[in-house]
């Protein structure tokens, strides 16, 4: 078996090696580097054909990717830029320390910005283009724990004031700054939320892809825009951070730049103490098809590497573990010499060739403005593939021996006076002893070179950054309800599902001249399941490269048609990626000044349960769009079983404040909800998004009852009344189970002469929110006339029991219990799902018509309206087991 080859194994034939290298150099010199690459590729292929089992080409030497000769000259004064950096470093640290001094519980992070500061400043001074009236700007996902530095820059620009900085993490009184990037809390400042960890990287990938989608569809020109994602090396362990790398390479997203801040530390300790995180990440990104730029060493190393012709130092560096390299930044000159030059005569000779001063100057590339500028310049110039910059830094850089490079750096909230003095001296911060002790914020004089440099650099790049647009310049003209007349009239005797009703509504919208081009249908490889294959040919499936093959079904009407101008995003089996596409579209009104209307349809079980963190971030990001949870309901999907049947997605959606949730039964309800959602989000520019569940069960859909529209939107309306005389019970239902409720009402009328009213509850969640809002108002306006909630007003006329049945766990319907004065009984599908027919499953969970009728009789028995003999008769008539186990535990 062939052993893997190491770059640094002993060379048994130096002359032969030299001949090969000289030949390669000749090809580069006399032909070009592309030809050299072609030859190397052919050689590697030939080697593998011989049976070689090793792994070649995924990592390179542990040195900078770009040679010193490629360093591009900075166009600014390094001295002025460093002076500006001193102000930023001080104010960022003072902000956190001042908050901690006020209340230690506030927390905050100092060390991350200290490590990434220079990279940010090179970006702000030379690369990050702002959005303005002339050009659209770049988009940036900033490393969450580093944002005090972003606030510090905004302070110097005059966007934030001292009071706001002093109120870092103190937001309740209205003059504070959010802990991390949160558009919900600072809507004109932050573009994207980036915590929790991992949501920034995956969101950035799909954001860059969506920019390309908009460009290829000729909606806007995005050629000059870049998406920047700043991540931590520890953050890359999150599956979301690396899970979508391939799509970025596959679609040649050269508008995307990742910058991984490799300070080698996560929250508790080293990221890879026994390994090398940079090499690991290089192999992953390179294997996925990305351009990898390693930014490891500062300019002081250039001389050493030039002298190291035989590669002895490179070899030494490659075998120093990260756990040991973590000490290098704060190590003494003597310790550095021992780490780098001990072990061989060649290394000792190399060490002897440089002075102690030169050894002390050896640092990491992530703190070298020149090296950063070269790396970023190369990244934005790269074509046909995304780029990652792996930048070596020190966590807590410049914060003193107690913090710099230490395992406690992440949680360091306090610095001693001596640490602050060290920081002041290290970066030449213009601050007096008294200002230092008081943690005063500092600004350069308005007429100083520093202030002028700051303003000039941002003016040349279009203005302040980051900044978020609250609304697009133009709102969309959305259709009124009359446009859905064919849906409102019912299915005219045909049996269809609400999913099919949605497809019909979507088809109507795709013919609306005002919004048809703004619609973005998104499906995670389930179009045929949902009956949406007709869209393949109608609007095309988006593909960055078009369709270079002949699909096997091309002769069919609804063949799989891919196009560079395609409208449908067919995401494959990838719910997280599909949601990120939806999120990019749902925030396009802000990020692109172009409102887009995304409809993401998916198995409801694989929505909030699977990507809840991203759904929460969507609320934070003020997303606007539609999520369609198809095949919803624990009994409605039937045969798919435990992992597929959804009985709780509405419980998850209810905790997101600006997620508006509905569970309609009939097509007219769906049409009313979607029309109202379009009006709210795209006509009125409300920062909400909609979650609507739909089923795959086919049945007839009646026309919309007169006067039902308001109730559908508010969350409830009376569907029908059965029987004569006084109402003895009120029955609530929604989704698939509303039809069981209707049958139950008929059973009660026919078998026991009990009159009932049946109500369609389109949204328990909206009813609860309205009731709680009224309760809050009444508690805090005790002298004003009390407000009555919508549900209380609708139930005012009843003094009988209310029975609610849904295809979800009881918690869903229990939301409104505090706001109902009547005796209230809920039926639901608590417990794990299982496979069987719909009828058997509904009987098992007790949400079938007979169980609903029996529960109603039991409620009347509890009120002493009927006797026990009626209950016993119903149990026998409806075959209700008296010893039935509770489904939660079965």
Feature map (PLM): residue ranges:
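Non-catalytic terminal/interface segments that mediate subunit docking, oligomerization
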Residues: 66, 71-92, 113, 128-131, ...
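Thiamine diphosphate
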Residues: 2, 14, 23, 170-193, ...
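A structural-propensity feature for long, helix-poor, extended segments
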Residues: 229-232, 236, 613-634, 639
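N-terminal amphipathic, basic-rich helices that act as targeting or association modules
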Residues: 2-157, 423, 496-512, 516, ...
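Cofactor-binding active-site loop characterized by glycine-rich and histidine/acidic residues
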Residues: 73-102, 109-251, 274-275, 532-535, ...
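Glycine- and acidic
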Residues: 6, 23-26, 73-81, 99-108, ...
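Active-site metal-binding loops of divalent metal-dependent hydrolases
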Residues: 227, 232-235, 262, 393, ...
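Residue-level marker for buried hydrophobic side chains located in beta-strands
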Residues: 229-230, 258, 522, 628, ...
């Amino acid at each position: 078996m062939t052993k893997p080859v190491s770059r640094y194994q002993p060379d048994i034939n130096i002359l032969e090696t030299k001949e090969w290298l000289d030949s390669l150099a000749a090809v580069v010199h006399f032909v070009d580097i592309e030809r050299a690459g072609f030859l190397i590729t052919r050689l590697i292929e030939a080697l593998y054909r011989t049976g070689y089992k090793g792994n070649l080409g995924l990592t390179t030497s542990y040195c900078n990717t770009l040679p010193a000769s490629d360093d591009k000259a900075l166009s600014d004064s390094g001295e002025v830029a460093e002076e500006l950096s001193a102000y930023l470093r001080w104010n960022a640290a003072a902000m956190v320390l001042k908050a901690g001094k006020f209340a230690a519980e506030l927390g905050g992070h100092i060390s991350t910005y200290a490590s990434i500061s220079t990279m940010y400043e090179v970006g702000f001074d030379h690369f990050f283009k702002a959005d303005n009236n002339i050009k659209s700007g770049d988009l940036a996902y900033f490393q969450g724990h580093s944002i005090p530095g972003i606030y510090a820059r905004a302070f110097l620009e005059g966007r934030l004031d001292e009071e706001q900085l002093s109120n870092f993490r103190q937001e309740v009184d209205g003059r504070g700054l959010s802990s991390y990037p949160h558009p919900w809390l600072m809507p004109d400042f932050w573009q994207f939320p980036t915590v929790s960890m991992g949501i920034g990287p995956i969101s950035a990938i799909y954001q860059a892809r969506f920019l390309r989608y908009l460009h290829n569809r000729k909606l806007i020109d995005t050629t000059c825009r870049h998406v920047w994602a700043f991540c931590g090396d520890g953050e890359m362990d999150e599956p979301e951070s690396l899970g979508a790398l391939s799509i970025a390479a596959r679609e040649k997203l050269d508008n995307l730049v990742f910058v991984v801040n490799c300070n080698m530390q996560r929250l508790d300790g080293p990221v890879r103490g026994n390994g090398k995180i940079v090499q690991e990440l290089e192999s992953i990104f390179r294997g996925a098809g990305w351009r990898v730029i390693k930014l490891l060493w500062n300019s002081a190393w250039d001389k050493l590497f030039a002298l190291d012709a035989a590669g002895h130092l490179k070899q030494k560096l490659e075998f120093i573990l990260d756990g040991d390299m973590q000490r290098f930044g704060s190590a003494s000159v003597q310790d550095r010499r021992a780490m780098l030059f001990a072990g061989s005569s060649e290394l000792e000779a190399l060490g002897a060739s440089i002075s102690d001063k030169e050894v002390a100057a050896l640092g990491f590339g992530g703190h070298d403005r020149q090296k950063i500028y070269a790396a970023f310049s190369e990244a934005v110039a790269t074509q046909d593939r995304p780029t990652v910059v792996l930048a070596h830094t020190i966590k807590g850089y410049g914060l003193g021996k107690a913090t710099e490079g230490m395992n406690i750096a992440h949680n360091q909230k306090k610095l001693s006076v001596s640490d602050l003095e060290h920081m002041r001296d290290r970066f030449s911060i213009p601050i007096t002893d008294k200002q230092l002790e008081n943690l005063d914020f500092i600004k350069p004089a308005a007429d100083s070179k520093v202030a002028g440099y700051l303003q000039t650099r941002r003016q040349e790049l279009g203005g302040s950054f980051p900044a978020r647009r609250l609304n697009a310049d133009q709102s969309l003209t959305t259709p009124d309800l009359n446009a859905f007349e064919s849906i409102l009239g019912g299915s005219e005797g045909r049996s269809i599902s609400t999913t099919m009703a949605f497809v019909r509504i979507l088809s109507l919208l795709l013919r609306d001249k005002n919004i048809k081009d703004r619609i973005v249908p998104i499906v995670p490889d389930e179009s045929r399941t949902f009956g949406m294959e007709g869209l393949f040919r109608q609007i095309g499936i988006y593909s960055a490269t078009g369709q270079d093959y002949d699909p096997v079904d091309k002769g069919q009407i609804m063949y799989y048609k891919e196009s560079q101008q395609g409208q449908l995003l067919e995401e494959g089996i990838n719910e997280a990626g599909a949601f990120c596409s939806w999120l990019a579209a749902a925030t396009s009104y802000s990020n692109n000044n172009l409102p887009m209307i995304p409809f993401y349809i998916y198995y409801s079980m694989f929505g909030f349960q699977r990507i809840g963190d991203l759904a929460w971030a969507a609320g934070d990001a003020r997303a606007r769009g539609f999520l369609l949870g198809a095949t919803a309901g624990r009994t409605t999907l039937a045969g798919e079983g435990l992992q597929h049947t959804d009985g709780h997605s509405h419980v998850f959606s209810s905790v997101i404040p600006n997620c508006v949730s509905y569970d309609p039964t009939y097509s007219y309800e769906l049409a009313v909800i979607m029309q109202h959602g379009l009006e709210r989000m795209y006509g009125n520019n409300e920062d909400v998004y909609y979650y609507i569940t739909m089923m795959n069960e086919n049945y007839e859909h009646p026309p919309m009852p007169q006067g039902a529209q308001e109730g559908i939107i508010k969350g409830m309306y009376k569907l029908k009344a059965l029987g004569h005389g006084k109402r003895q019970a009120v029955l609530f239902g929604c989704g698939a189970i509303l039809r069981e409720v209707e049958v139950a009402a008929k059973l009660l009328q026919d078998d026991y002469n009990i009159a009932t009213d049946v109500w369609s509850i389109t949204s328990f969640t909206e009813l609860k929110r309205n009731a709680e809002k009224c309760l809050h108002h009444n508690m805090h306006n005790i002298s004003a006339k009390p407000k009555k909630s919508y549900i209380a007003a609708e139930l005012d006329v009843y003094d009988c029991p209310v029975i609610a049945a849904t295809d979800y766990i009881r918690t869903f319907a229990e939301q409104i219990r505090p706001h109902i004065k009547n005796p209230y009984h809920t039926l639901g599908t608590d417990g794990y799902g299982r496979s069987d027919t719909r009828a058997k499953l509904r009987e098992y969970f007790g949400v079938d018509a007979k169980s609903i009728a029996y529960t109603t009789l039991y409620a009347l028995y509890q009120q002493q309206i009927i006797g026990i003999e009626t209950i016993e008769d119903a149990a026998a008539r409806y075959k209700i087991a008296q010893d039935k186990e509770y489904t939660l535990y079965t």
